[in-house]
């Protein structure tokens, strides 16, 4: 097993804000309270946490409901112990594989802090409150040939928090069929079948599967929908409603500051934006601010009425981390690019509501390759970044290597001859009539285009005649950049476990380097 690195700025769709957070932190310092990867910053963030014994005891009691056997809770109960938090939506069959990478990064950072004098434990926040079922009702896996396959829960759950959605017929048979032929496919399918049982919920099954997959790591899970956590969240939610006009004004100003710095805002905010939803009758109701009132369809609520029902409120994406950290002694949050961008906006909410802010630490990202795929890439002279232009350009590149050398030499010689002849003609035309030289330039571009077009056609024909190369290209694209997405953002961890074994998370954990800001390419 070995790893190489790719700069995050070389990955598709990396925002300027995220790239600057990683590689030019001085440019984003105004939007984050602490720098990254600095022991003194973590110590300062830990020292800023004012967590009373009463609050700590209430937190431990709430955590024990779902984590009764976790030794980490005994450590968290000790004064001064801080939390390294990460979290994710409770997606089908554990969601995208980066979920696992976030958890493992949190575990490693907590250990590093503990080893360096700041006692810390990892915590995983289950985003059970979210109500966008379409974001979590599916999962992508691949088969033994790296053909992507989407598995889906075909039902609706309008306005219902996804964590409480009951499983009717989870697509375990389809998963088993897709993983068939992979060395550990049956073992992985059995594990999923045991955790995603009909009658369970999305939240419970997600947590149980992660607990089983990461059994060697002691990670307590936080379910904000549990009554004990609703009560713990209530004071901060009450404060957010009370200060809503001022908070909205601060967010609008922060968005202008981000825009002036050349960055975009992750969350759109307007004057009527509500920072909270209302949980009622098993649904998460959208609210809109209208003056001093909140509106849902034809219903109206005063701020005072919502404050009286604070335990039934649910934060929106930009307020959520603040509410989370009002309940937890969070020293750092491990997040992906979008989450790190949230913090640039949320900083103003942290400042007003908590008076402190954790370090926003980008998670480690991975592209995982098997040894055969790595050898194929070496054979064709490919890097991971070569796949980000899509399958067609990649196939053309592979195909160009299959063109008979003599034919390739002839094409290149023809191109050189034409360019030389056109150059001589252009020089004489320019002396005679410059407009004719300009007309020749246009014609030359057309000639070059036609030669390049013929070269691509020749390469495609060579690819058609070489079935193995075509198959290799399809397999590599399906593994590395499936459906034009980064591997970690599309595929679940499950097919990788089915291919490499259930000890893969331990191997990934060992490979994490906290000081590395780059995306890692890991050959297993």
UniProtKB/Swiss-Prot annotation:
Pfam families: CC_BshC (PF24850), Rossmann-like_BshC (PF10079). InterPro entries: Bacillithiol_biosynth_BshC (IPR011199), CC_BshC (IPR055399), Rossmann-like_BshC (IPR055398). Its EC number is 6.-.-.-. Residues 437-457 form a coiled coil. Keywords: Coiled coil, Ligase. One of its GO terms (molecular function) is ligase activity. Transmembrane segments: none annotated. Belongs to the BshC family. HAMAP family: BshC. This is Putative cysteine ligase BshC. The lineage of its organism: Bacteria, Pseudomonadati, Acidobacteriota, Terriglobia, Bryobacterales. The gene is bshC.
């Amino acid at each position: 097993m070995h790893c190489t690195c790719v700069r995050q700025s070389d990955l598709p769709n990396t925002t300027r804000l995220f790239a600057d957070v990683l590689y030019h932190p001085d440019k984003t310092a105004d939007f984050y309270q602490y720098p990254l990867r600095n022991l003194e910053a973590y110590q300062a963030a830990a020292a800023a946490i004012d967590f009373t014994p009463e609050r700590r005891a209430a937190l431990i009691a709430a955590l024990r409901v779902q984590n009764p056997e976790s030794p980490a809770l005994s450590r968290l109960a000790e004064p001064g112990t801080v939390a390294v938090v990460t979290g994710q939506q409770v997606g089908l069959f554990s969601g995208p594989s980066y979920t696992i990478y976030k958890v493992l990064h949190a575990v490693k950072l907590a250990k590093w802090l503990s080893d360096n004098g700041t006692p810390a434990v990892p915590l995983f926040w289950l985003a059970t409150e979210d109500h966008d079922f379409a974001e979590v009702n599916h999962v992508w896996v691949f088969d033994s040939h790296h053909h992507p396959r989407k598995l889906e829960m075909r039902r609706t759950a309008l306005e219902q928090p996804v964590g409480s959605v009951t499983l009717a017929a989870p697509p375990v048979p389809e998963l088993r069929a897709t993983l068939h032929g992979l060395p550990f496919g049956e073992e992985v399918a059995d594990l999923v079948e045991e955790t995603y049982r009909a009658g369970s919920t999305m939240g419970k099954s997600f947590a149980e599967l992660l607990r089983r997959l990461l059994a060697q790591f002691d990670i307590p899970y936080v379910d904000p929908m549990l009554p004990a956590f609703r009560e713990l969240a209530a004071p901060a939610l009450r404060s957010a409603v009370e200060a809503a006009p001022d908070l909205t004004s601060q967010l609008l100003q922060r968005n202008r500051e981000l825009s002036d710095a050349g960055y975009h805002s992750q969350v759109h905010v307007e004057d009527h934006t509500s920072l909270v939803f209302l949980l009622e009758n098993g649904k998460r109701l959208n609210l809109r601010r209208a003056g001093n009132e909140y509106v849902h369809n034809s219903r109206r609520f005063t701020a005072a009425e919502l404050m009286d029902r604070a335990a039934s409120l649910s934060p929106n994406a930009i307020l959520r981390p603040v509410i989370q950290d009002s309940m937890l002694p969070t020293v750092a949050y491990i997040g992906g690019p979008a989450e790190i961008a949230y913090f640039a906006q949320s900083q103003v909410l942290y400042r007003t509501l908590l008076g402190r802010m954790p370090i926003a630490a980008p998670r480690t990202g991975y592209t995982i390759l098997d040894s055969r795929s790595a050898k194929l890439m070496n054979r064709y002279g490919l890097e991971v970044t070569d796949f980000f232009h899509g399958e067609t350009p990649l196939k053309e590149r592979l195909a160009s290597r299959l063109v008979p050398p003599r034919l390739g030499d002839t094409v290149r010689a023809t191109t050189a001859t034409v360019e030389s002849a056109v150059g001589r003609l252009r020089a004489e035309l320019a002396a005679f009539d410059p407009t004719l030289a300009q007309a020749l330039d246009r014609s030359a571009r057309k000639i070059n285009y036609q030669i390049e077009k013929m070269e691509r056609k020749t390469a495609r024909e060579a690819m058609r005649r070489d079935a193995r190369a075509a198959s290799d290209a399809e397999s590599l694209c399906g593994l590395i950049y499936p459906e034009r997405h980064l591997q970690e953002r599309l595929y679940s961890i499950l097919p990788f476990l089915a291919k490499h074994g259930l000890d893969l998370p331990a191997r990934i954990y060992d490979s994490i380097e906290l000081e590395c800001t780059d995306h890692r390419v890991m050959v297993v």
